[in-house]
């Protein structure tokens, strides 16, 4: 059997202990983008959300939001475990480790934000504890968590694992993000929807980064294997947001949501250099106004472009960033 080619980004070298000179400008710019996008949970105003929660939402809508937040709160912990126990030790280049280090900080903020939202909305201690322990107590969350965890605990190749976690951040969050943006379109829950915009932008960048790292591997997955991982994630997400926790609870169409998940998967496949599988268009035109890069904002609030401008100005002009590795939802097919 022929030996596999060595992977430079996975091969230990003394250079990994020093940040400069930059060897991978695209990775460095991704890191600076992440740094420029830093935010904290204290910046999200939840004062109106309590009024909307009590007076403007139906019981079905409250049920949906509770369980979506329970999934989000649990999933960020899984992403954190993967970063700290696998990817940070797998990848041997300092620019990528800088990104992962910052991603760990941001995932902690996401986890804090989701936990704070549950703490704010759910007054009953027993119910709140049930939701905080969603991986153990809510079967549809358990199934998604088990799928993600098998890529942390298993012996799969790095290429398989990086694709799987691109699916976690690019597909497993897609239906829930979309449903919360639907509430934003209706002018409800401004704190929840503002934090959702910040978090979806962050996760879009994390997914972009996974695609970029994958593109640097010399040995990539064969197309059938790559598609199998992505399509498996699509089926699990479809079951979650169309059946187990149906988006109909917030007034969204099941068939269109299923198509939207397929659309997101095709975008991810393209970003990974693979042919699309589903060949569908985005059924939610209003989502095109909110790409996963956070390009716009429906209302008067800041965010979309919320970032530290001085940080990004320091990298433009000296870091070659290639849009081929950007995973977004506002492009034509």
UniProtKB/Swiss-Prot annotation:
Residues of the signal peptide: none
Any GO CC annotation of this UniProt entry: cytoplasm
Residues at which Fe cation 2 binds: 107, 169, 203, 206
An annotated Gene Ontology molecular function: ribonucleoside-diphosphate reductase activity, thioredoxin disulfide as acceptor
Cofactor: Fe cation
CDD domains: RNRR2
Catalytically driven reaction(s): a 2'-deoxyribonucleoside 5'-diphosphate + [thioredoxin]-disulfide + H2O = a ribonucleoside 5'-diphosphate + [thioredoxin]-dithiol
Binding note for cofactor: Binds 2 iron ions per subunit.
Protein location: Cytoplasm
Biological process annotations from GO: deoxyribonucleotide biosynthetic process
EC number(s) from the headed UniProt entry: 1.17.4.1
Effect of deleting the gene: No visible phenotype, due to the redundancy with RNR2A and TSO2. Rnr2a and rnr2b double mutants have no visible phenotype.
Primary location group: cytoplasm
InterPro entries assigned: Ferritin-like_SF, RNR-like, RNR_small, RNR_small_AS, RNR_small_fam
Residues binding Fe cation 1, per UniProt: 76, 107, 110
Record-annotated active site: 114
Tissue specificity annotation: Expressed in roots, rosette leaves, stems and flowers.
Taxonomic superkingdom: Eukaryota
Chain's role: Provides the precursors necessary for DNA synthesis. Catalyzes the biosynthesis of deoxyribonucleotides from the corresponding ribonucleotides.
Record note on quaternary structure: Heterodimer of a large and a small chain.
Similarity annotation: Belongs to the ribonucleoside diphosphate reductase small chain family.
Protein name as catalogued: Ribonucleoside-diphosphate reductase small chain B
Species annotation: Arabidopsis thaliana (Mouse-ear cress)
């Amino acid at each position: 059997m022929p030996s596999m080619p060595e992977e430079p980004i996975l091969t230990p070298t003394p250079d990994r202990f020093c940040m400069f000179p930059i060897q991978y400008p695209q990775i460095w710019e991704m890191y600076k983008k992440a740094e420029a996008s830093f935010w904290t949970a204290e910046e999200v105003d939840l004062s109106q959300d309590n009024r909307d929660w009590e007076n403007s939402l139906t019981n079905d809508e409250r049920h949906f939001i509770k369980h979506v937040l329970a999934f989000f709160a649990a999933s960020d912990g899984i992403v954190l475990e993967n970063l700290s126990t696998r990817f940070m030790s797998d990848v041997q280049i300092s620019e990528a480790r800088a990104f992962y280090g910052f991603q760990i900080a941001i995932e902690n903020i996401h986890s804090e934000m989701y936990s704070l939202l549950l703490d704010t909305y759910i007054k009953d201690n027993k119910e709140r504890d049930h939701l905080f322990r969603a991986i153990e107590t809510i079967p549809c969350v358990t199934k998604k968590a088990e799928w993600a965890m098998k890529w942390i605990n298993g012996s799969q190749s790095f290429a398989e694992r990086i694709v799987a976690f691109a699916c976690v951040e690019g597909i497993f969050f897609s239906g829930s993000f979309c449903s919360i943006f639907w509430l934003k379109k209706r002018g409800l829950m401004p704190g929840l929807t503002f934090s959702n915009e910040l978090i979806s932008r962050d996760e879009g960048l994390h997914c972009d980064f996974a695609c970029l790292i994958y593109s640097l591997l010399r040995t990539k997955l064969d197309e059938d294997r790559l598609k199998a991982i992505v399509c498996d994630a699509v089926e699990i997400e479809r079951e979650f947001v169309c059946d187990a926790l149906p988006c109909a609870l917030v007034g969204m169409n099941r068939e269109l949501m299923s198509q939207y998940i397929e659309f997101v998967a095709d975008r991810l496949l393209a970003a990974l250099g693979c042919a699309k599988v589903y060949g569908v268009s985005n059924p939610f035109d209003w989502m095109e106004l909110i790409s996963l890069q956070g390009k716009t904002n429906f209302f008067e609030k800041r965010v979309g472009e919320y970032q530290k401008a001085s940080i990004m100005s320091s990298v433009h002009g000296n870091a070659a960033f290639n849009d081929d590795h950007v995973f977004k939802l506002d492009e034509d097919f």
